[in-house]
């Protein structure tokens, strides 16, 4: 995956890695100078993922930061390849609410990945929006027309 992402690792190696080393790899592979907001977002993403993925450290799985969708130039914050599924994660660091535009953004990324990445055509892609200051979450899912999954909004 040359130049398609800024960082790629197995879950096990990512979870054992010092967060500053992961951040350093992101900076080293980034073309240009990362803004302070980008740097803070990456730090937040690394912290969250190293915490929540810990129970999965023995899984044969990969984590990819800043994956560029072929032919479109869009970058997905994080892609997780786990148990035959592709998780497309879009972080909104410091944000409390899941805005409709953000939901549409992560759904578009998942659809773009399915349409423009040949190894994803026949895979289930799970788009996940993560507003990091949101107080609740939902575990309710429903299949969408394209065979992907879409989060059903919770009423609580």
Please report, for each region that a protein language model flagged, where it lies by residue.
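Accessory nucleic-acid engagement/destabilization modules that flank
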Residues: 1-156
């Amino acid at each position: 995956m040359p130049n398609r992402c800024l960082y790629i690792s197995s879950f096990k190696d990512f979870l054992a890695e010092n967060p500053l080393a992961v951040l350093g790899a992101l900076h080293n592979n980034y073309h240009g100078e990362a803004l302070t907001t980008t740097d803070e977002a990456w730090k937040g993403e690394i912290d969250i993922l190293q915490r929540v993925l810990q129970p999965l450290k023995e899984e044969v799985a990969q984590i990819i930061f800043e994956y560029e969708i072929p032919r479109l130039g869009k970058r997905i914050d994080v892609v997780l390849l786990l148990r035959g599924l592709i998780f497309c994660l879009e972080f909104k660091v410091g944000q409390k609410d899941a805005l409709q535009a953000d939901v549409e953004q992560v759904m578009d990324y998942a659809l773009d990945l399915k349409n423009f990445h040949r190894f994803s055509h026949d895979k289930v892609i799970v788009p996940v929006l993560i507003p990091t200051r949101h107080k609740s979450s939902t575990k309710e899912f429903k299949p969408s027309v394209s065979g992907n999954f879409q989060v059903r909004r919770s009423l609580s």
